[in-house]
């Protein structure tokens, strides 16, 4: 009963409604028989006579191919007596089968359980030892492999039909003889619909519809069981069945150990699963099937392929003339960088520094670095950039490559230091050996020559001592010179700082005095005796300049005295250089002071002019007017012409010049700033005066306001102004 329940679970059948739709010729009695057979029971009440002698078939609509029918025996094949209860083996019948007349072997009540066990053992562990093992042929290109680039299609299932019916023995024999010629084919699963596997690779699925390329029934055993006589002894049957069970178990173990071993070779699979001739979908010849059989898995796709088949990602078949030897094409793998290579790369880059030169030279340097490392330029540059981006900010104690670099540097320093020490020691040893050899030579010589030789040796020693003393003296002299140079530079810096501070103080005092004078002059009203005041101010400025010059001369004399005292302690060459530098620096500073004083004087004079021009006098002060190269608005000629060309000297504007001007003078300056319409650029002279320019004409040569005449007058005025200030 347990076995039949397992049969029920493995062969799930549908309701009687589906059975009535597929088989219109069945009666209610047949439907009852079907239900009883599904449950695995055969009661006497269900074993009634049926008017029709047909078999009851049940469809499996969920099968992956054409409809498979599981056939059960009819009423005629069942014996009512409990001692002779028979259960024939179930069989498949295809929908395309036309004849359904066959007979099945009847079993005794004792053999019922044994046949059930044999049936389930055959379903769970089919044998491979059978000669005529049924196979499945699909419409795919290669039956032994699954191609990843091909869309999966449902395979067409071709199953030989076996119908069990309790008719005449002659018909049974004839049908068995006919069906022995056909090749039975069963469903074969592709890798996409694979059974469940354990981590070791062994299959755990016992369903007959999902076991790969395994026959559901051993037809030779079925035929033998059908051909045997019913009156044969039960003992012989049991022995045969036990032997078959042992063989099946052994075959199952060998298949599970070899078929699902993923580390095994494909040759073992081919030996265990022999390939059968395929049916091409278009009905092609056998050569096409051989080419399709030549395909392999995508992992070893091009190992045995020529140029023709490698394009289509296929293996060369045995009939291919350009078949290659079974040598795998080597895959180009990247060579990893070791720590030593990285250190060497960084050292070479730091030494050659290819990034600090032009592009061509840097390319050559990168190429030389790459050639020494045995790599390409791009790989070396990429690795260098990665190293610098990753590892430059990390500390030395963390990164191993930085540690290696430090260790290499330390080793190099130790090697260099040890090499130098070894060289010194070797020199000392050589000298000692030389002295010893010379002493031995002198001992063999006569006494007179020995004395002469010793005298020479003593002289050489004295010379060497003198040279060493001279070297020490020279080193001491150099150190003293360096110290003297440092002291002299410090003294120069101090003097320059002092002079600069004094000059700043004097400049500030002069500015304060000027501001005081300006304020006093603004408070006083302008009078007719302005010329006398101008002369007094000029004399005062001259006296101030003379006093400043005297102070500068005194400073120069002091510096010269210091230089003379300093020169006595130094060598002549060094004293000359130092004194020249010092004098040049002092002279440049004095010149700057003179220029500043001159500028101050000129500004004083001009300020006096601006203050004295507050009166509406018509006197043309040629000196100050020529400095701006213009005429006052109150000239006797009445020409308000503004000359565009100023002298090279810039006017010394005081900080608040506009505040010191009278309102009338401000208005005159505003009128003068209104330049004419057609003013030309600064680099070219005007060709006409303002009156002729308004008429768009050139000035005639006798025009008093002609620009050439005005320029000549202005040049003369500028010369007079410069002579006056000098």
Curated annotation (Swiss-Prot):
Superkingdom classification of source: Eukaryota
Q: Where is this region: Disordered?
A: 15-109, 124-149, 161-239, 272-303, 516-726
Q: Where is the Myb-like domain?
A: 329-388
Q: Compositional bias (Low complexity) at which positions? A: 18-39, 81-108, 165-177, 221-239, 516-651, 709-726
Residue ranges the record marks as coiled coil? none
Query: Compositional bias (Polar residues) at which positions?
Result: 45-80, 124-147, 183-209, 661-675
Q: Where are the transmembrane segments?
A: none
UniProt-listed PANTHER family: GATA ZINC FINGER DOMAIN-CONTAINING PROTEIN 4-RELATED, LIM ZINC-BINDING DOMAIN-CONTAINING PROTEIN-RELATED
Q: What is the protein's given name?
A: Myb-like protein Z
The organism that produces this protein has a lineage beginning with: Eukaryota, Amoebozoa, Evosea, Eumycetozoa, Dictyostelia
């Amino acid at each position: 009963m347990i076995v039949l329940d397992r049969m029920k679970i493995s062969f799930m059948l549908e309701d009687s409604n589906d059975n009535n739709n597929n088989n219109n010729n069945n009666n209610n009695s047949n439907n009852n028989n079907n239900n009883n057979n599904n449950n695995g029971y055969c009661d006497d009440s269900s074993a009634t006579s049926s008017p029709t002698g047909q078999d009851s078939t049940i469809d499996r609509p969920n099968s992956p191919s054409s409809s498979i029918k599981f056939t059960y025996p009819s009423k005629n094949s069942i014996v009512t007596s409990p001692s002779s209860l028979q259960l024939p083996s179930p069989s498949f019948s295809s929908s395309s089968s036309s004849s359904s007349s066959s007979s099945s072997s009847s079993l005794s009540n004792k053999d019922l359980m044994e046949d059930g066990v044999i049936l389930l053992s055959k379903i769970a562990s089919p044998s491979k030892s059978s000669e005529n093992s049924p196979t499945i042929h699909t419409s795919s290109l290669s039956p032994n492999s699954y191609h990843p680039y091909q869309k999966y299609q449902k395979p067409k299932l071709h199953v030989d039909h076996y119908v069990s019916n309790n008719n005449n023995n002659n018909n049974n024999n004839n049908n068995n003889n006919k069906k022995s010629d056909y090749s039975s084919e069963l469903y074969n699963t592709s890798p996409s619909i694979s059974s469940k596997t354990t981590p070791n690779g062994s299959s755990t699925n016992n369903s007959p519809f999902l076991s790969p390329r395994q026959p559901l029934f051993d037809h030779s055993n079925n035929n033998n069981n059908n051909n045997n006589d019913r009156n044969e002894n039960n003992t012989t049957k049991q022995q045969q069945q036990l032997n078959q069970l042992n063989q099946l178990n052994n075959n199952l173990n060998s298949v599970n150990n070899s078929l699902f071993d993923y580390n095994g070779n494909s040759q073992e699979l081919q030996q265990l699963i022999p390939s059968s001739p395929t049916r091409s979908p278009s009905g092609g010849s056998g050569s096409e099937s051989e080419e399709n059989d030549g395909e392999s898995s995508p992992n070893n796709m091009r190992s045995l392929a020529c140029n023709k088949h490698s394009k289509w990602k296929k293996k060369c078949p045995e009939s291919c003339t350009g078949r290659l030897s079974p040598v795998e094409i080597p895959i180009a793998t990247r060579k990893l960088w070791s720590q030593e290579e990285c250190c060497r790369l960084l050292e070479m880059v730091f030494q050659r520094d290819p990034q600090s030169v032009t592009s061509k030279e840097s390319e050559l340097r990168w190429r030389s670095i790459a050639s020494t490392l045995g790599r390409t330029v791009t790989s070396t540059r990429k690795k260098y950039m990665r190293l610098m981006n990753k590892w430059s900010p990390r500390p030395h104690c963390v990164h191993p490559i930085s540690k290696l670099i430090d260790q290499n540097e330390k080793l190099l320093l130790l090697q260099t230091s040890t090499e130098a020490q070894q060289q010194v020691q070797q020199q000392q040893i050589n000298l000692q050996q030389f002295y010893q050899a010379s002493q031995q030579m002198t001992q063999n010589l006569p006494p007179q020559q020995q004395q002469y030789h010793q005298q020479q040796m003593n002289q050489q020693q004295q010379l060497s001592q003198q040279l060493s003393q001279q070297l020490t003296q020279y080193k001491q002299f150099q150190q003293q010179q360096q110290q003297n140079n440092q002291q002299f530079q410090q003294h120069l810096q101090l003097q320059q700082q002092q002079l600069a501070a004094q000059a700043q103080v004097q400049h500030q005092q002069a500015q304060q005095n000027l501001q005081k004078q300006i304020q006093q002059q603004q408070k006083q009203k302008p009078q007719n005796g302005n010329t006398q005041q101008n002369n007094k101010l000029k004399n005062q400025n001259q006296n101030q300049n003379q006093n400043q010059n005297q102070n500068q001369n005194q400073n120069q004399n002091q510096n010269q005295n210091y230089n003379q005292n300093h020169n006595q302690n130094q060598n002549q060459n060094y004293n000359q250089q130092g004194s020249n530098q010092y004098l040049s620096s002092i002279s440049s500073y004095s010149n700057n002071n003179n220029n500043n004083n001159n500028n101050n004087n000129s500004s004083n004079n001009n300020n006096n002019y601006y203050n004295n021009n507050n009166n509406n006098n018509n006197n043309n002060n040629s000196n100050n007017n020529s400095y701006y190269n213009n005429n006052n608005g109150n000239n006797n000629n009445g020409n308000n012409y503004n000359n565009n060309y100023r002298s090279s000297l810039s006017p010394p504007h005081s900080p608040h010049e506009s505040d010191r001007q009278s309102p009338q003078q401000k208005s005159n300056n505003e009128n003068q700033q209104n330049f004419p319409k057609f003013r030309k650029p600064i680099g070219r002279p005007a060709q006409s005066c303002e009156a002729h320019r308004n008429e768009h004409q050139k000035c005639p040569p006798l025009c008093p306001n002609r620009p050439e005449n005005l320029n000549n007058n202005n040049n003369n005025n500028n010369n007079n102004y410069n002579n006056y200030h000098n």
